[in-house]
Design a protein with these regions (language model features):
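Active-site helix/loop module of the DD-peptidase/beta-lactamase fold
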Residues: 114-148, 202-236
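A short, well-structured edge-of-sheet supersecondary motif
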Residues: 59-91, 329-331, 336-340
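Structured C-terminal helix/loop/strand segments within mature extracytoplasmic catalytic/sensor domains
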Residues: 32, 318-464
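Active-site SXXK
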Residues: 81, 94-121, 143, 192-196, ...
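Active-site Gly/Thr loop motif
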Residues: 220, 276-338
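Short, charged, amphipathic alpha-helices and their helix-cap/turn boundaries
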Residues: 77, 82-83, 153-178, 202-223
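Secretory targeting and sorting signals
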Residues: 1-31
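Active-site-proximal alpha-helical segments within enzyme catalytic domains
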Residues: 188-195, 237-259, 282, 327-344
Length: 464
């Protein structure tokens, strides 16, 4: 545990950062540049030639070819609201976002906050009255910024998926004071889905569709979002969505939460979501930032500190929803730009395999963003940084104790069996919340099967 003085300092620093969270202002289109209005539901996204939005056509083509050649199955570049080029051989089909789901989830949370259902500084005890003081005092903000301080390991979180991650979260002991330490946790995010349901009276997915996706023109059959064993929407990585619809979400973020004449998400929330914390200057509300001079990564048993921005050589106001193997929804306000990159890596950094959890560890993605942003002709490019010469810090495993924290067998078994200090007595792998596992599995298969059937039936709609 950190000292009381350190905790107070961290709290004050975080409060100062969030109180003065800047709201990014998208770059204004140069005189004579094309601008494209927001598409209506069912409409194709408007296009423009690169030169019409002050981008070098040859450089755009070269960047797109590079991205596709580096494993991208959907690479799209938008400027001033216009699609200026893409390489999307898979067509406009729903693609798995992995952890980029977290960023989309943060937009849904932002909509609920904007509508006044709860606030980011509300404590969990407001929604879970049975929580003990340790868990009750954790705030929504600390969940969004991955700084709850609760015990985290991958085996424990995987075990939680087979039981109930909300109950698991409320049973986990604290390793750190809330707000002081960044950990790239997974199951703790499930409490956000439950909070939306408790406060709005709607299923999380129904709320997301009604209040956010429908206003953006995203049809229900355009996405699939799986649930965990207990029926909670998997906010940590369970969404598959069409690249074009991800571009709509990216544009919403670029426009500080406005769409047409509606303020779907408060600009203040967007500003806080894209501002780092004392625990991790490179991470906002489930969103990765290029603004920090340093950032902490996804390593276990403790997140490693990097002494550089996440994307050296790219604009510092860049922020991104990021998922394993290189799923990106990236916004660059200073270039009035949205970039979509979905696919797989053709290069693996063996020195930092955990970096694959966000795709940022792959130098090809760093190179791609530099090429795309440097193609803008009305704003000087950032100084080039060769990503292939960058070295990553060593993994934080220095002995058997660290290895034990990574493997964490006692915690995982405790959760699966429903016994011990890490587990909820109401849930184990065979019986959870009054239901046997076959009932839960059948229900989940019906749910995701219905979504997949709907998505397959809609593949012929909204041709690009």
């Amino acid at each position: 545990m950190t000292s009381r003085r350190a905790v107070m300092f961290t709290g004050v620093a975080t409060a100062m950062l969030t109180a003065f969270a800047p709201v990014a202002v998208p770059a204004t289109a140069a005189t004579g540049d094309a601008t494209c209005s927001e598409p209506l539901a069912g409409q194709s996204l408007p296009r423009a030639d690169p030169a019409q939005v002050s981008m070098d056509p040859a450089a755009v083509d070269a960047a797109l070819d590079f991205g596709a050649g580096a494993g991208g199955v959907a690479v799209q570049i938008y400027r001033h609201g216009c699609l200026v080029g893409d390489r999307t051989p898979t067509g406009n089909v729903p693609l798995p976002l992995a952890s980029a789901t977290k960023g989309v989830s943060a937009t849904v949370i932002g909509r609920a906050v904007t509508l006044g259902y709860f606030g980011v500084d509300d404590p969990l005890g407001k929604f879970f009255p049975g929580a003990d003081p340790t868990h009750a005092n954790i705030t929504v903000r600390q969940v969004l910024t991955q700084s709850t301080g609760l015990h985290f390991s991958w085996p424990a979180d995987i075990a939680g998926l087979y039981t109930d991650p909300v109950l698991q979260t409320l049973a986990e002991p604290a390793d750190f004071e809330p707000g002081t330490t960044f950990q790239y946790a997974q199951n703790v995010i499930a409490v956000l889905s439950k909070i939306v349901e408790l406060t709005t009276g709607s299923d999380f997915q129904d709320f997301a569709q009604r209040e956010l996706f429908t206003p953006l023109g995203i049809a229900r059959e355009n996405w699939v979002w799986v649930r965990d064993r207990s029926g909670n929407t998997a906010l940590n990585g369970g969404l598959a969505m069409r690249p074009d619809d991800l571009a709509r979400l990216g544009r919403l973020m670029l426009q500080n939460g406005t769409w047409g004449d509606r303020q779907l998400i408060d600009a203040d929330y967007i500003g806080q979501a894209t501002t780092g914390t004392a625990a991790n200057p490179g991470y906002g509300f489930l969103t990765w930032l290029n603004a920090g001079d340093t950032y902490r990564g996804t390593e276990v048993p403790s997140a490693v500190a990097y002494d550089r921005p996440q994307f050296p050589g790219s604009p510092r106001d860049l922020f991104s929803f990021e998922g394993a193997l290189g799923q990106f929804v990236t916004i660059v306000p200073s270039r009035d730009m949205v970039i979509i990159r979905m696919g797989v890596p053709l290069r693996i950094n063996l020195a930092n395999p955990v970096g694959m959890l966000t795709g940022s560890g792959n130098p090809d993605n760093k190179e791609l963003y530099q090429r795309i942003t440097a193609a803008v002709t009305d704003i000087p490019a950032e100084p080039y940084v060769n990503p292939y010469t960058l070295s990553d810090p060593p993994l934080p495993i220095h002995g058997l104790d660290d290895l034990g924290r990574v493997i964490d067998p006692v915690t995982a078994v405790s959760i699966l069996l429903g016994v011990g200090p890490y587990a909820s007595t109401a849930c184990n792998i065979l019986w959870c919340n009054g239901k046997p596992v076959p009932v839960d599995v059948f229900r989940l298969l019906l749910d995701v099967g219905g979504q997949v059937v709907g998505a397959l039936g809609a593949l012929g709609n909204y041709q690009r």
